[in-house]
Amino acid sequence: MFSVLSYGRLVARAVLGGLSQTDPRAGGGGGGGGGSSGDYGLVTAGCGFGKDFRKGLLKKGACYGDDACFVARHRSADVLGVADGVGGWRDYGVDPSQFSGTLMRTCERLVKEGRFVPSNPVGILTTSYCELLQNKVPLLGSSTACIVVLDRSSHRLHTANLGDSGFLVVRGGEVVHRSDEQQHYFNTPFQLSIAPPEAEGVVLSDSPDAADSTSFDVQLGDIILTATDGLFDNMPDYMILQELKKLKNSNYESIQRTARSIAEQAHELAYDPNYMSPFAQFACDNGLNVRGGKPDDITVLLSIVAEYTD
């Protein structure tokens, strides 16, 4: 009988072989160059807090606690993503941030190398996950993931969301698109996993193909907020929209201030024992007597759709 890892590597080789094709516009290296008149791009800023922020435990790079994120620019598309490492692995001596961080860094590298199709964000997630499965030294862990791709020329946003991270698209002060949260049961989101052989059949593991995928047109000035559940569990839509009203233009500095304001407010609410958070409301709906915010890692990527410039 194959172990989980042995079987995973065989699947990874087969999948990677089938994903070798790329969009012709995405070939030939990353970075800028060749933007056509009328192309769209994303101006993106991020902010976040690790759950242990009060203890001064911050990680290097684009990681906030067990969360990770990336923002990558290619001539054919702007791509960004967030991932939330499953903290339960810490009980088994595994650093949950290693899985989520490596997953996001692999996604970023694929985009910069042009090894992706803008209309297929699930493909980015699948190829990245398969590369993790192929590691000679197993990288154990689990993570949710959300990938957002703006195709410059078609002005379409393509998304893939697995688990309870997610995105909002705001236009004219209203949410016009949003991701669907995926849960097996309360507080147990869909997740990508790599488990040791002895844990076969015990650790939850979903396929990248299980990600909820959407595609839709966007307009200049649309606001896209991509975040881990640490935000959405602590701030309802109306609070997020109130903060977004402060965003008056597409200057990076303005976006950065707003992203920080949103992340800071979510972080403060997470430690308020009297606050009826979205997470507490969801818990009550599931028969649990819970009140207060949910202390968690928080990652926020805030983007505005603008005219593309190299």
UniProtKB/Swiss-Prot annotation:
One GO cellular component, as annotated: mitochondrion
Residues holding Mn(2+) 2: 84, 229
One of the GO BP terms on file: positive regulation of ubiquinone biosynthetic process
Chief location bin: mitochondrion
The entry's keywords: Hydrolase, Magnesium, Manganese, Metal-binding, Mitochondrion, Protein phosphatase, Transit peptide
An MF annotation (GO) of this entry: protein serine/threonine phosphatase activity
Cellular compartments annotated: Mitochondrion matrix
Cofactor list: Mg(2+); Mn(2+)
Cofactor binding comment, as recorded: Binds 2 magnesium or manganese ions per subunit.
InterPro entries the record matches: PPM-type-like_dom_sf, PPM-type_phosphatase-like_dom, PPTC7
Top EC group: hydrolase
Record's protein name: Protein phosphatase PTC7 homolog
Protein species of origin: Mus musculus
